[in-house]
């Protein structure tokens, strides 16, 4: 409620775009094979991991490994110059999209609940940005990935509790 009160009227449209870009980014990364651009010739992993775990019998392993594939997919899209969401930065662009796709795969939540959870994740990212640093150049990669993990934790916690006060 707080977020909707203080944001612009078109904020929901903006968040829908964030959702779409994250979802599409993971999908593209899962579908693409080969090597990443550049001289290092780093092989893409997301498609292979996603395909291999489809035969996994343990449902917890299946979900865990699929989520890992989602994170790789978004990170590989970033590394190949694809369209991503900086959440909070390019260097950590796989964390929140992986959790978003995880939540969608669980099929336990309504779309509006996932959208509200994304807003809470953004709130956490803004708190860190205003009171600390999300910049790898300024505070090291732990600032980027730590913030992304905090945002993802808030996203998942909101889906579980629907209580922003408990999260913040």
Name every feature range the model reports, one short phrase each.
Residues 127-168:
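Hydrophobic alpha-helical bundle architecture
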Residues 5-140:
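Accessory "access/gating" subregions that flank catalytic or transport cores
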């Amino acid at each position: 409620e707080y977020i909707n009160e203080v944001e612009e009227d078109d904020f929901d449209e903006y968040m829908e775009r964030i959702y779409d870009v994250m979802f599409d980014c993971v999908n593209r990364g899962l579908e693409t094979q080969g090597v990443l651009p550049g001289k290092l010739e780093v092989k893409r992993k997301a498609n292979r991991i996603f395909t291999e775990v489809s035969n996994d019998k343990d449902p917890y392993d299946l979900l865990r490994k699929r989520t890992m594939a989602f994170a790789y997919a978004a990170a590989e899209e970033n590394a190949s110059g694809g369209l991503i969401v900086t959440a909070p930065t390019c260097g950590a662009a796989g964390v929140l999209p992986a959790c978003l796709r995880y939540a969608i795969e669980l099929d336990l939540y309504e779309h509006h609940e996932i959208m509200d959870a994304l807003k809470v994740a953004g709130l956490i990212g803004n708190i860190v940005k205003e009171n600390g640093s999300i910049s790898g150049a300024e505070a090291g990669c732990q600032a980027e990935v730590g913030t992304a993990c905090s945002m993802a934790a808030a996203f998942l916690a909101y889906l579980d509790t629907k209580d922003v006060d408990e999260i913040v």
